[in-house]
From Swiss-Prot:
InterPro entries: ACAP1/2/3-like, AH/BAR_dom_sf, Ankyrin_rpt, Ankyrin_rpt-contain_sf, ARFGAP/RecO, ArfGAP_dom, ArfGAP_dom_sf, BAR_dom. This is Arf-GAP with coiled-coil, ANK repeat and PH domain-containing protein 2. Residues 266-361 form the PH domain. Its main location: membrane. PANTHER family: ARF-GAP WITH COILED-COIL, ANK REPEAT AND PH DOMAIN-CONTAINING PROTEIN 2 (PTHR23180:SF241), CENTAURIN/ARF (PTHR23180). One of its GO terms (molecular function) is zinc ion binding. SUPFAM superfamilies: Ankyrin repeat, ArfGap/RecO-like zinc finger, BAR/IMD domain-like, PH domain-like. It comes from Gallus gallus (Chicken).
Length: 781
């Protein structure tokens, strides 16, 4: 309620003035009580809100812990992390709201009470004091006798001075009242308006935040619906399988009895057996036994290192034991000791005895073949299928994938945080990672990083060789080029996961630390290729190589290149022979005088796609990684070179590792050039057996025909390349077998898998054995 005190009434000091003062003073006292109460309620609200934010933050930490626990499930980890980050932003918005509430309500209203109302109270005290003095002066003036002239003058002077002081203080008091009445409205409304604007900002920020999250939540909902459908289908399948298993007759043994001498994981047979201890009590303990790598080993728990019972099965024998009380026993005897074992049934005992005997025979056979294979290794006419067992033996006895990869410069520590002894790798980037950073990489998606264990997963030879061609030092020189310049601190092994995650996303997803390429000083069309005229003599000599992008030998990049070779050609002789071979196949004929040799600019002047295209031919893996970091499209098409792709260029360059690198980074194995030839066509024409094997394993379409109506098989038959013909026919036969067996057929014939595995091993470790096509022709007069 607004009450205005009139200045005229103030001078009169009338009863109306006194009544107005009394009303104003009561109103101000009530206002003070209301404001004090509101401030206390505001403080309680802010404290409660901060407690809510603290509890909410603890809840967010719980979600993050759950996300970290689910690091092996990319869907759960990614979504929980994103949701926790969003809710953390809402907590921040709540804290901002409470801070603004404290400033707008608590601070402003407390200031009004402590300053403005306090001034009113001080003015009231002075007014009451001078009013009392005036009343005393009036009473004294009235009591003075007429005949006492001296007292009359003194009383009159005091009364005059008191009235003058009263009027001055009364006017100040009235002014303070009117100012307070006017100011309180603006102060109260201003604080409330500021409070409401704080809420407006809070809800607006929340709306914007969840508007961005909306499509993501919608996509997740669709994924959950699909997961529910898949879960229902899996449940039905499991119930059906459960019913089928229940209907089977398990009156006999319920343990798998098969053994496989050529198992991919090297384990011939495994299962539980009782083992008699060698102590004085001869106790029997149940352990998990396995036959692997020509050894008999056992372990109690999976995390325990296997205990070797027999180091070399060739030095032992196995026999039945019928002279002891326990049933189903057999004994494995070596020159130094014997081991008494017991199976659960007679069938299992016979299976184990047969598995040990077969493993002994296999070990002797492999040992006997070693000398013959060593002799055949030096012969140029050695069959391509003869070295498969040798290669497998070499890998079994050689260094492990972990040892080979970690010996590359920089690979002994995590590429992103520096933790020692990393046991995970990103195979498309070519780096080693610790387990925490590998979980973050896995959350990025396979289009950014493909994570694999160096100790738990199997490694194909071409992939292992790719890891040895790159390494942390090479990749960090590309992806951390501007790290010091930008002043960014690299995470340490002890850094928080959130800090590592932000750094890894900035490094590989946003590529913030990659050195930007300077703008080329040529037009976009000219930046693709620069054509230089050549003499007729130069054209004649370079004609066979025009399809290879015809890069001059002197223009080779000085940077590090892959040591991999798919064709084992020398600098001069093999190129000349290869050109004549290609001409004989009539698939790479010159297209008249229009084709000319192309010379590239420095890589800094190339667009990323052309940079990748050039580096793929030159077998320059660091340059290829740099081009991808600069945004090169892995399936970039060079319109000036018959729509060839980097993968086709890698085939022409003759590097198996380069092809593997492009495939790991998403290269399409079936994209064809202007003449209808894909990578498989080009590899077949050039006689690159290892590349043909790689492309077939990656799903290359061998039925596709080029503009001449030739598929890869007809090209290989025409060129009389026995190895490639064998691979193509085996792949086609395996494909037909799978189609005939239907959905539940076997994934592939064992012979097919063994042969392709042998070819992969030879292409990576002994490529010279796959070059019979070139070698036999070069020996012709």
């Amino acid at each position: 309620m607004k009450v205005t005190v009139d200045f005229e009434e103030c001078l009169k000091d009338s009863p109306r003035f006194r009544a107005a003062l009394e009303e104003v003073e009561g109103d101000v006292a009530e206002l003070e009580l209301k404001l004090d109460k509101l401030v206390k309620l505001c403080i309680a609200m802010i404290d409660t809100g901060k407690a809510f934010c603290l509890a909410n933050k603890q809840f967010m930490n719980g979600i993050r812990d759950l996300a970290q626990y689910s690091c092996k499930d990319a869907l759960v980890e990614t979504n929980l992390t994103k949701f926790s980050d969003t809710l953390q932003e809402m907590i921040n918005y709540h804290n901002i709201l409470f801070d603004q509430t404290q400033r707008s309500i608590k601070a402003q209203l407390q200031t009004f009470v402590k300053e403005d109302i306090k001034k009113f109270k001080d003015a009231k005290k002075q007014f009451e004091k001078v009013s009392e003095e005036k009343e005393n002066a009036l009473v004294k003036n009235a009591q003075v006798q007429r005949n006492k002239q001296h007292e009359v003058e003194e009383a009159t002077n005091i009364l005059t001075a008191t009235r003058k002081c009263f009027r001055h203080i009364a006017l100040d008091y009235v002014l303070q009242i009117n100012v307070l009445q006017s100011k309180r409205r603006s102060e109260i409304l201003k604080s409330m308006l500021s409070f409401m604007y704080a809420h407006l900002t809070f809800f607006h920020q929340g709306y914007d935040l969840f508007s961005e999250l909306g499509p993501y939540m919608k996509d997740l909902g669709a994924q959950l619906d699909q997961l529910a459908v898949d879960a229902a289908k899996e449940k039905r399948d499991m119930e059906q399988k459960h019913s089928t298993i229940q209907q089977k007759d398990y009156s006999g043994d319920d343990t798998k009895l098969e053994y496989n001498v050529d198992a991919a994981n090297g384990i011939v047979m495994e299962g539980y057996l009782f083992k008699r201890a060698s102590n004085a009590f001869k106790t029997w303990n149940r352990r998990w036994f396995s036959i692997q790598n020509n050894q008999l080993v056992y372990q109690k728990k999976f995390k325990d290192n296997p205990t070797v019972v027999v180091e070399d099965l060739r030095l032992c024998t196995v026999k039945h034991c019928e002279d002891i009380e326990r049933r189903f026993c057999f004994e494995v005897v070596s020159p130094t000791k014997s081991c008494m074992l017991q199976a659960d049934s007679e069938k299992l005992r016979q299976a184990w005895i047969k598995a040990v005997q077969t493993s002994i025979a296999t070990a002797y056979r492999e040992k006997g073949d070693e000398s013959e294979k060593q002799e055949k290794k030096s012969s140029p006419s050695t069959g391509s299928l003869e070295s498969g067992s040798e290669t497998k033996e070499k890998l079994l006895k050689g260094e492990s994938a972990l040892q080979r990869v970690q010996c590359i410069p920089g690979n002994a520590a995590c590429c992103d945080c520096g933790l020692a002894d990393p046991r995970w790798a990103s195979i498309n980037l070519g780096i080693t990672l610790c387990i925490e950073c590998s979980g973050i990489h896995r959350s990025l998606g396979v289009h950014f990083s493909k994570v694999r264990s160096l100790t738990l997963d199997s490694w194909e030879p071409e992939l292992l060789k790719l890891m040895c061609e790159l390494g942390n030092d090479v990749i960090n020189r590309i992806y951390e080029a501007k790290l010091e310049k930008m002043g960014v601190k690299k995470p340490q092994p002890g850094s928080q996961r959130q800090e590592k995650e932000m750094y890894i996303k900035a490094k590989y997803v946003e590529r913030k630390f990659v050195e930007k390429q300077p703008a080329a000083a040529v037009s976009p069309l000219e930046s693709r290729t620069k054509v230089l005229p050549q003499s007729q003599e130069e054209k004649r000599h370079s004609a066979p190589e025009k399809s290879f992008l015809a890069i001059e030998q002197g223009a080779a990049s000085p940077r590090v290149r892959s040591s991999d070779s798919g064709i084992q050609q020398s600098v001069d002789d093999s190129r000349e022979h290869l050109a004549s071979t290609i001409s004989a196949n009539s698939l790479y004929e010159p297209e008249g005088e229009k084709q000319e040799s192309s010379v590239f600019y420095d890589s800094r002047q190339l667009n990323p796609g052309l940079h990748l295209y050039r580096a793929a031919f030159e077998k320059n893996l660091p340059d290829m990684a740099e081009a991808l970091a600069h945004g090169a499209e892995v399936n970039w098409v060079n319109m000036e070179e018959n729509k060839a792709t980097p993968l086709i260029q890698a085939v022409r360059g003759g590097s198996l590792v380069t092809c593997e690198f492009l495939l790991q980074n998403g290269a399409n194995v079936n994209i064809r050039d202007m003449k209808g030839r894909g990578p498989l066509h080009h590899a077949t024409v050039l006689g690159h057996t290892g590349q043909v094997c790689l492309f077939l394993k990656r799903g290359a379409n061998q039925h596709a025909t080029d503009e001449d109506g030739k598929d890869p098989l007809s090209i290989a038959v025409e060129a009389a390349n026995a190895d490639i013909v064998t691979l193509l026919r085996l792949a086609r036969m395996n494909e037909e077998m799978r189609e005939s067996e239907g959905l539940y057929g076997q994934p592939g014939d064992e012979i097919y898998q063994d042969i392709f595995r042998d070819f992969s091993q030879m292409a990576s470790n002994n490529p010279e054995k796959l070059n019979r096509f070139q070698q036999s022709d070069s020996q012709k007069p």
